[in-house]
C-alpha cells in the first residue's frame, strides 16, 4: 500500500473501498503500429495509487518510491477531488518522451478526460523526470490538436521539485491546468516552474510565487497558451520565460525577475524573454506571442528580449521595466543557435516607457510601434556579439519605427532604420542623427 489516511489507524482503509487500485500497472500490450494516444499512454503509465472512478479524498499521504511510477495516477472521465494531503515522489525515470510528453514518473498525473481538483496539497518530487502536477490531454503530442477535456484545478498548494526534467506544473497533449495561489520551486535542469511540452494545451494561473533555480529552467516555458495574473515569477539562472513556436504567454499584473547567467543547449545569448523555434517538433512553427500588462519586468543579466528563428509579436502596456545589465539591450532580433526559420518581430508599446539598445541583425526584421504616450530612450544598430563574444552581425537589418502623435523617441546614439512613420519633431536627437534609408531625418528636436 502506497498511501495512508493520516487520521486513522494504518491499514484500516482498503484500496477498493475508494475505487483505487494500488500499485497495479496496466498489462495490455501496445501494438507496433499504435501512435501516441490516450490509450497508449494509459499502457505506459502506472501509479502507486490509481484512481479510476469519481472520488473525494481528504487528508491522505500518497507516496511512490519506484522508478517510472506516479504517486497518484488519475485515469477516468469522472470528477476527482483531493484535498489536505501530501504527495511524495522519489525514484528516477529513465527520462525521455514518456516523462516529458505523457507524464510518466510525475508525482501526480491526470489524464482520461477527468476534471481533478487539488486543494491544499504539499507535493514533493525528488527524482529525475518527476514533474509535480501533470495534466495530459490525450492528443498524442499533436501540436494544435484538441485535448480530451482533461483539466487539473490546483489551488493553495506547495510544489517542490529537485531532479532534472521536473517542472512544477506540466501541461501537454491539449491538457488544461488552472492554478491559483501556488508556491512552486524547482531546482533541476529543464524544470520550468510553469512547464509545457509537446501537444500544448491551456494554462491559467492566478496568484502565487513560481521560482526556478536550474539551468534551462525559466519560470515559464511555453509550448501552449499560457495566461498568468497577479503572480511573482523568478528565474535565478535561466531566462525568465521562453516561448517556442506558435504559442503564447500573457502576463497581467505580474512581477517577473530573471538572472540568466549561463547559456543552455544551442543558445548563445543570455536574456530574460526568449522567443524562438527549436525545430525539434515540440512546437508548431508560426507567430509566437508575448503580452504583458502592468506589473514589473526586471532583467538582471543579458538582453531583456531576444527573438530568433521565429516570428514574434510582443506587446507591453504600462509595465515597469528595469534592465540591470551594463549593456542595456532592450531587444535583439538576430541569429542564434537554431536555423530554419525567420528572425522577425513586431513590438507594440502602449503607454510604455522603453530604454536601451535595439539590435537587429542584417538578415532580421523588426517593426517597433510606440503609441498612447510611449517613450523610447535608445538607439538602433546592427552590430551584435553573443555571450561568447562572437560576432553575429555587423549591419542593421530591416527596421521600421512608428510613433503616434503622443509618443517620443530620444536618441542615445546615431541610429539607422529602413522606414520611419511619425512626426520628426517627436524624435529628440540629443546630439545624434537618425538615418532613414541612409538619409538623415530633418526636423528632429
Can you annotate each of these PLM segments?
Residues 96-99:
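Feature marking well-ordered beta-strand scaffolds used for ligand recognition
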Residues 23-32:
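Bacterial lipoprotein signal-peptidase II cleavage site
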Residues 395-401, 411-421, 435-436, 441:
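Surface-exposed loop/turn positions within long extracellular repeat scaffolds
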Residues 64-71:
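Beta-strand-rich domains and repeat architectures in extracellular enzymes and scaffolds
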Residues 43-59, 74-92, 104-125, 134-162, ...:
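Surface-exposed loop/turn motifs in large extracellular/passenger domains
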Residues 1-15, 24:
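N-terminal secretory signal peptides and thylakoid transit peptides that target proteins
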Residues 31-43:
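Post-signal peptide N-terminal segment of mature Sec-exported envelope proteins
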